[in-house]
């Protein structure tokens, strides 16, 4: 069986996902076969595997760092919040049902079998499995049915490293408090502490580390600096929404919907020279920009109502009159249509709602969820303004619970040629007559270098700007960032001690 290492944190957003990715890349660099694992993930940012199964985006990112293909075994349970009180439960990559928090808490013991089987499968195929916890292990009201923190560590007999975030302040109290609330056998399983996101002079911190070790009787195995790495990270979502790209000739505004999903779709745009990417958050106006993007959402009807409530629909209509580019991805594509129908009340109590009406499309929400990896070709009869996009091949994935039907003479945007490796020919998306508004179900479309370059150059041409000749290859860029992440963490942590700890827990 494989060696095991589990990363738990004193709270959410302390950097567990990124550290798991770092360990995955370090072990890969050291010649080991390694896989990430998180028994239960709660996230709206998801990924579709080669088999057409849905997992958390963080585990797909960690698999990339490990140099292996993402698999549903790496994240057997995915919870996708659809409201403040309910989540869609995705079990082994497929939708199981919607549950309230109370219902799910009662259901958790039935999931142990699936979790153990999937972990054992990864352990049989790899030399090392790096496990990520969720939130904090010290949620004492949830401990009796825990399947993701200490319950998980005990199930597979994994050693635990506890991570604290010093950037927010209070790191010593959070570490000591977490250990205080754990049972003795759980404290004994924690083999070391990691201080994450440190800025400043390490010499000033050292006395505090010594005092902490004397108080909690745990060794600090490393202090990891605040890292400027550009990697898809779920915990970085809030920070990302308030971050602004540097000044540029082209400004792109992404509407931060209440239930925005797969926000990583737009990260490649931020890496394009001359592009300023920003998110329009609650209470903010769209303002002056060249492109408005309405992203995917886990609750299309609810987020359309919110968009109208914020009066952003009025601004979008003004953008349309000014001839700006308006793009919808997945749920955003549905929002751009004329009407969204939900006869089964799957998303809300509203059976029908008017869309923005910028595309001649009708969407019906259905129980069956489409989850596929796809290959597509942009259609060759796009309006002249978008002619540089014609016949460009793209790859991406679909995640949606509705089907959209083009009304009237509106033209499709692309032709899907492959779904999960099987050849097909299905139209996708829709485009306005003048080419200034288009929608697609293809997540990840902006990770296709040629498509992004030509689209940005179309926008640049509309402003009288010269074209950009080349942009970075996003996949190569991410590989460099994984290596950079691993180098920083390797230099900051006692890796010899980490290997010794894993060997002691070897089955």
UniProtKB/Swiss-Prot annotation:
Q: Where is the active site?
A: 330, 443
Q: PROSITE patterns of this UniProt entry? A: GATASE_COBBQ (PS51274)
Q: Which residues form a coiled coil?
A: none
Q: In which pathway does it act?
A: Cofactor biosynthesis; adenosylcobalamin biosynthesis
SUPFAM superfamilies hit by this protein: Class I glutamine amidotransferase-like, P-loop containing nucleoside triphosphate hydrolases
* Gene3D superfamilies xrefs: 3.40.50.880, P-loop containing nucleotide triphosphate hydrolases
The Gene Ontology biological process annotation of the record reads:
cobalamin biosynthetic process
Q: Which UniProt keywords apply?
A: Cobalamin biosynthesis, Glutamine amidotransferase
Q: Which residues form the GATase cobBQ-type domain?
A: 249-451
Q: Which InterPro entries match?
A: Class_I_gatase-like (IPR029062), CobQ/CobB/MinD/ParA_Nub-bd_dom (IPR002586), CobQ_GATase1 (IPR033949), CobQ_N (IPR047045), CobQ_synth (IPR004459), GATase_3 (IPR011698), P-loop_NTPase (IPR027417)
- Family, similarity comment: Belongs to the CobB/CobQ family. CobQ subfamily.
- Its recorded name reads Cobyric acid synthase
| Organism of this sequence | Thermoanaerobacter sp. (strain X514)
